[in-house]
Regions:
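N-terminal export signals
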Residues: 2-17
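Active-site-proximal alpha-helix that buttresses catalytic centers in soluble enzyme cores
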Residues: 20-110, 115-121, 161-187
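Generic beta-sheet signal
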Residues: 31-33, 144-150
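Short, surface-exposed amphipathic charged segments that create phosphate/polyanion-binding patches used
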Residues: 121-130
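Membrane-proximal amphipathic alpha-helices
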Residues: 133-136
């Protein structure tokens, strides 16, 4: 069952996850990460057989709705006074485009750890290890939050949560191998 509270969607909350509608509060947690699944794409699942990293013509890309949603996410975060210390993205075009549309004035850091490993791409174990190690470092050292634009499979493996396109999970490393889910948001919808 989906309940709407302002700008937040609460879906399948695990026990112990706070549900108050405060993205600002969640991201104030030192070392927090906003794990955002790329915005809405054209129809399809995965990527075409002739997929090549770095060649957007061979990938499933953002739809016009997705492009508008990414811009709206960025404007909403700005309106809330939330500016990430860094923005990292999967190297897939749909993720890079989501990040660039959200944060046109920030440097976007492509990061292999956020790449999809669906359909046999990448190295799931190595990528998850990199992401978990970086999140643990951020929890120890970072006073701010980062935005990581990635894919459903990565977010699910890191948090145990499923996200729709354009939906985000606010999380923080809880030990070396796990993420504590702070909350989830569907953005300005």
């Amino acid at each position: 069952m989906l309940a709407r509270l302002g700008h937040l969607s609460l879906l399948a909350w695990p026990l112990g996850v706070r549900s108050e509608p405060s993205l600002r509060q969640w991201l104030a947690s030192p070392g927090a990460v906003l794990l955002l699944r790329h915005a809405q794409t054209v129809s399809g699942l995965g990527d075409p057989e002739h997929f090549r990293l770095g060649d957007c013509t061979t990938q499933r890309n953002l739809s016009q709705e997705g492009r508008a949603d990414a811009r709206a996410w960025g404007a909403w975060l700005t309106e809330l006074g939330l500016r990430p210390t860094a923005v990292r993205s999967s190297q897939w075009c749909r993720c890079l485009d989501t990040a660039r549309l959200m944060f046109p004035d920030q440097t976007i850091q492509p990061w292999v750890a956020l790449n999809s490993y669906f359909q046999g791409h990448g190295d799931r174990a190595a990528q998850l290890r990199m992401a978990r190690m970086e999140a643990a470092r951020l929890a120890r050292e970072s006073p701010g939050f980062e935005v990581w634009v990635t894919h459903q499979v990565v977010i699910t493996d890191l948090t145990g949560q499923y996200t729709a396109m354009g939906e985000a999970i606010a999380a923080r490393a809880s030990g070396a191998q796990t993420f504590a889910v702070l909350g989830r948001s569907s953005g300005p919808r």
